[in-house]
Structure formats: C-alpha cells, structure tokens
Amino acid sequence: VLGGANFPDKYPWEGGTKTWWSTLYSYDLQTGKWTVYDDFLDRPLAYGVSISLPEGLLCIGGCDRTQCSDNVFLIKKEEDSFVIDSVSYPSLPVPLANATGAMGDNCIYIAGGQETMVNEQSTHHFYMLYLMHKERGCQEMPDWNGPSLSYAVGVAQGERFYLFSGRSYAPDEAM
C-alpha cells in the first residue's frame, strides 16, 4: 500500500481535514508482518493508477493536495528493502489523477482522469504504453464515444481495453 489520502481525525462531514500520505506499507506473506516505510515518496501522492508487473508495482500519475502528477515510476524490491525506479518508464503526456488503467498484451492503457486539482474536469484522455518499446512513450489513442470520465473502471482483455462507469464532471458536457 503506497501513499493515499484520508480523514484520520474526523469524518469530513464533522469538519475533518484530509491528510495526504507518502508512506509505503509492505506485508510479508512468510512472516505475516507489516513493515512501514515512512516518507517513502518524496511527496505525498494519492489517486494514481497502479499496475502489477513481474518486476514490481508500476505507479502512474496521481495527485497531492494542490496538483496532479505526470510521473510514472516502478517500486521494486531489492534485497531487504524497496526502491523507486523513476527513469525506466516515460512520463504521462499530461498530469492525471483519478484515471483508470489496465494491462493487456504487454500494453498499459490509461483512460480518463483529471489534469488539475483546481477547476476539476473529467477528461477523454486515452493513452497506451507498449512495454516492449517504452522509448516511444505513451501513445495517444482515439477518444471513446460518450462523456469524459474520471473514477472509471478499466479492464484489458488481450488487445482490447474496456471502460466502465465513472463520473463525468466537465462543465460544458451534456450527459
């Protein structure tokens, strides 16, 4: 478990303040124990996309209290600790949080989300990263029919990507 945001002291409707985290929690299946890595990230980060890969956990985008991120990085285990590989994967073309993503046939798909924490708007962004040719970067894919989306669900099956549900909150868009 990495980063995230919550209301640790009070519920939001009771006046609670959202707290953003940079902590990594790791559960060891052999020992049955949790290890906590405080300040694992260089800044708090939440609402990104995570994709499990054989070499580690790929983290894509996300946001903190004030801005969205275009960073893409891999968390991998080296000996008895975890490290961040922030150079092996290309950044997103735009900052994105609250997007969805999935992997199929060596391709990672990222769809929807929002670019900013101010004047929040859902988007039609749709990108594909071919893992065999990361040097090409994230390729822009055609928009889907229908409204822009954030908080959607994405699933890949073979070479196909399916986009379900979500929220549309673009001010100039009719539902």
Question: Where does each model-flagged region fall?
Answer:
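Kelch-like beta-propeller repeat domains
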Residues: 1-175
